[in-house]
């Protein structure tokens, strides 16, 4: 297969394909919000972006969940999948492809890929003995287990002993190739802590892994031995490839891999790191395909410092959270307050405090009061000042000049908290600047040029902040842009706002038709039960 060199102008990224044994939880929402922010940022840079999400629908866990409700597995999946799609709509996620592992065209891709790996001599039949976690859909090594034969991830679940004939993938064959790849591509696994985990795991010696199950009806049959069902992970990882097909394409690897492959970024939770950073690249090497650019494993979420779980009754309902506070609020808190890659905590009191402080007070009040001053102090509700009138040593201009480059660097390494933090520094400096300069006092002294200079400088800084935060808070950013006289909606993909222009300080012109001041984020009143 001749794969063309992927264009610099394209960027493909994936969330995990979420397991549909239940409705989506806040952890799934977290990964997807991050992916959407990356996708929106890449679009600002002028790239064609493909954001892939979807659902992993095969396996024993789903079969058992369906049986417990007296339903067929497909019926069960068909009822759960819409809850993911509706949550993504609520969160303002602009995904391009939703890949379901039960899709007919996915089976064609899986069968073709299996045939390639079979022809490479990397699949054989053997006896599988070991402890199996149904929730992980994975065999566990004895040294990994907790007391009472419990899974280290699903601590309330006992693993099951299995002894059965399975097909295996020769993972051990790729030990050296993988180690050499990790060495020559140090950014492949991120952050550094995850990379070290993988290097440590691989250095202990890779074992061949089972890619089929017997006594399991729910999944694709092994192409040359239908008594066996393909292991959920062998099938699920390939759904990233299936998602690359255009709707009218015949489902072949050649068609799928033509434009978007290799994937630029796989975003995952750290619990599925091994599958994406070890098994997946080895499978691709076996099939003779280029490897993805980057796998980023983020941390887990806790609530009020405690691990979340249904048994503890302390889960965070993402649907309820968005319905109560709005999508921008939820996106902002999780991306700004948690260092992506580390574990993070949700606390509703802190959540409300952060939103009120950053969005309602610092950003919202600043825009509102400044626009009202323009209305009060400037003829025809317009500024006569332009960027050329502002000296380079102006406090806010000096801060704004390099801000775009700093924020770009932060977004590119998925440091959303840093991107938000440096933008907020400009907003806070703008609040201090307007208080220090006191345009109301300058107006009384009839120093009109200075009044307008102060107001221009602050409004331009708010504009720049809105633009740079638009991947995180697109609704609020759109509202700000429209109040500043730009007919731009950051949710409309046809509205072109090139980074090279809009990330520069000084874009606001003296011809702007400023909009009416409106609150961009209403202060949240804290109820007693929070």
Curated annotation (Swiss-Prot):
Compartmental location: Cytoplasm
Cofactor: how bound: Binds 1 zinc ion per subunit.
GO MF annotation terms: ATP binding; metal ion binding; methionine-tRNA ligase activity
Binding locations of ATP: 310
GO biological process: methionyl-tRNA aminoacylation
Entries under CDD domains matching the protein: Anticodon_Ia_Met, MetRS_core
EC numbers: 6.1.1.10
Primary location group: cytoplasm
Keywords: Aminoacyl-tRNA synthetase, ATP-binding, Cytoplasm, Ligase, Metal-binding, Nucleotide-binding, Protein biosynthesis, Zinc
Motif ('KMSKS' region): 307-311
List of residues binding Zn(2+): 133, 136, 151, 154
Cysteines engaged in disulfide bonds, as pairs: none
Reaction equation(s) it catalyzes: tRNA(Met) + L-methionine + ATP = L-methionyl-tRNA(Met) + AMP + diphosphate
Enzyme class: ligase
Cofactor: Zn(2+)
Annotated Gene Ontology cellular component terms: cytoplasm
Role of this protein: Is required not only for elongation of protein synthesis but also for the initiation of all mRNA translation through initiator tRNA(fMet) aminoacylation.
Homology family: Belongs to the class-I aminoacyl-tRNA synthetase family. MetG type 2A subfamily.
Assembly and oligomerization: Monomer.
Protein name, UniProt field: Methionine--tRNA ligase
Taxonomic lineage of the native organism: Bacteria, Bacillati, Cyanobacteriota, Cyanophyceae, Nostocales
Encoding gene (name): metG
């Amino acid at each position: 297969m001749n794969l063309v060199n992927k264009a610099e102008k394209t960027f493909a990224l994936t969330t995990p394909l979420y397991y549909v044994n239940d409705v989506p939880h806040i952890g799934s929402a977290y990964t997807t919000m991050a992916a959407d922010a990356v996708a929106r940022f890449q679009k600002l840079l002028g790239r064609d972006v493909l954001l892939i999400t979807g659902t992993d629908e095969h396996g024993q866990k789903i079969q058992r969940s369906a049986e417990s409700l007296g339903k067929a597995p497909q019926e069960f999946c068909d009822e759960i999948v819409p809850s993911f799609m509706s949550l993504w709509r609520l969160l303002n996620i602009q995904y391009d492809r939703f890949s379901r592992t039960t899709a007919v065209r996915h089976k064609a891709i899986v069968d073709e890929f299996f045939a390639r790996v079979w022809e490479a001599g990397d699949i054989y039949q053997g006896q599988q003995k070991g402890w199996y976690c149904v929730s992980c859909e994975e065999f566990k090594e004895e040294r990994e287990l907790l007391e009472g034969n419990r899974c280290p991830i699903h601590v309330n679940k006992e693993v099951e002993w299995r002894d059965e004939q399975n097909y295996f993938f020769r993972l051990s064959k790729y030990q050296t190739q993988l180690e050499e790849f990790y060495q020559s591509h140090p950014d492949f696994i991120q952050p550094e802590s995850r990379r070290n985990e993988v290097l440590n795991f691989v250095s202990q010696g890779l074992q061949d892994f089972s890619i089929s199950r017997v006594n399991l009806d729910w999944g694709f049959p092994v192409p040359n031995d239908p008594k066996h069902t393909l292991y959920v992970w062998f099938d699920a990882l390939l759904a990233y490839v299936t998602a690359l097909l255009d709707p009218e394409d015949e489902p072949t690897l050649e068609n799928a891999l033509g434009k978007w492959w290799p994937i630029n970024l796989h975003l995952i939770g750290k619990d599925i790191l091994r599958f994406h950073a070890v098994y997946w690249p080895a499978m691709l090497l076996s099939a003779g395909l280029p490897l993805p650019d980057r796998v980023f494993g983020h941390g887990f979420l806790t609530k009020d410092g405690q691990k979340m779980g249904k048994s503890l009754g302390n889960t965070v309902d993402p649907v309820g959270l968005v319905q109560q506070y709005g999508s921008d609020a939820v996106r902002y808190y999780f991306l700004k307050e948690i260092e992506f890659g580390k574990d993070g905590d949700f606390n509703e009191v802190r959540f409300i405090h952060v939103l009120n402080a950053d969005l309602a007070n610092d950003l919202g009040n600043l825009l509102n009061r400044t626009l009202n001053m323009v209305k009060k102090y400037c003829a025809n509700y317009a500024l006569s000042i332009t960027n050329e009138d502002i000296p380079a040593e102006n406090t806010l201009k000096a801060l704004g000049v390099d801000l775009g480059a700093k924020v770009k660097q932060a977004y590119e390494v998925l440091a959303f908290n840093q991107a938000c933090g440096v933008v907020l520094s400009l907003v806070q400096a703008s609040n201090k600047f307007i208080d220090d300069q006191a345009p109301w006092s300058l107006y009384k002294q009839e120093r009109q040029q200075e009044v307008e200079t102060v107001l221009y400088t602050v409004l331009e800084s708010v504009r720049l902040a809105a633009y740079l935060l638009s991947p995180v808070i697109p609704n609020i950013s759109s509202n700000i842009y429209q109040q500043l006289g730009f007919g731009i909606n950051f949710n409309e993909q046809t509205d072109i706002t090139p980074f090279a222009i809009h990330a520069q300080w000084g874009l606001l012109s003296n011809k702007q038709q400023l909009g009416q001041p409106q609150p961009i984020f209403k202060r949240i009143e804290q109820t007693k039960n929070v």
